[in-house]
Structure formats: structure tokens, C-alpha cells
From Swiss-Prot:
It comes from Gloeobacter violaceus (strain ATCC 29082 / PCC 7421). Belongs to the PetG family. The 4 large subunits of the cytochrome b6-f complex are cytochrome b6, subunit IV (17 kDa polypeptide, PetD), cytochrome f and the Rieske protein, while the 4 small subunits are PetG, PetL, PetM and PetN. The complex functions as a dimer. Pfam families: PetG (PF02529). The keyword Cell wall biogenesis/degradation does not apply. It is a single-pass membrane protein. One of its GO terms (cellular component) is plasma membrane. Keywords: Cell inner membrane, Cell membrane, Electron transport, Membrane, Photosynthesis, Transmembrane, Transmembrane helix, Transport. GO terms for molecular function: electron transporter, transferring electrons within cytochrome b6/f complex of photosystem II activity. This is Cytochrome b6-f complex subunit 5. Component of the cytochrome b6-f complex, which mediates electron transfer between photosystem II (PSII) and photosystem I (PSI), cyclic electron flow around PSI, and state transitions. PetG is required for either the stability or assembly of the cytochrome b6-f complex. The chain crosses the membrane at residues 5-25. It is found in: Cell inner membrane. It comes from the Bacteria.
Length: 40
């Protein structure tokens, strides 16, 4: 059984991380620099 505290941290941290990445990518795209999206 997973510890409730660890489970709560993971469930709270993952959506925030995904949202942060999406916001960062959207802000960079909004600034007019879509050329760096397909370089990886």
C-alpha cells in the first residue's frame, strides 16, 4: 500500500508540473518563437 502522504504529494505535484510546462511552452510560443519547437 502506498503511503497517503506520498500519494498526496505525487497527485499534487504531477498536475502542477504538467501545467507549468504547458504554460511555459505557451508563453514562449506567444512571444513569436515557434521555431524552437521541433529541434529536439
Amino acid at each position: 500500500m502506498i503511503e497517503p502522504i506520498l500519494l498526496g504529494m505525487v497527485l499534487g505535484f504531477v498536475p502542477v508540473t504538467i501545467a507549468g510546462l504547458l504554460v511555459a511552452a505557451w508563453l514562449q510560443y506567444k512571444q513569436g518563437n515557434p521555431s524552437g519547437l521541433g529541434e529536439k
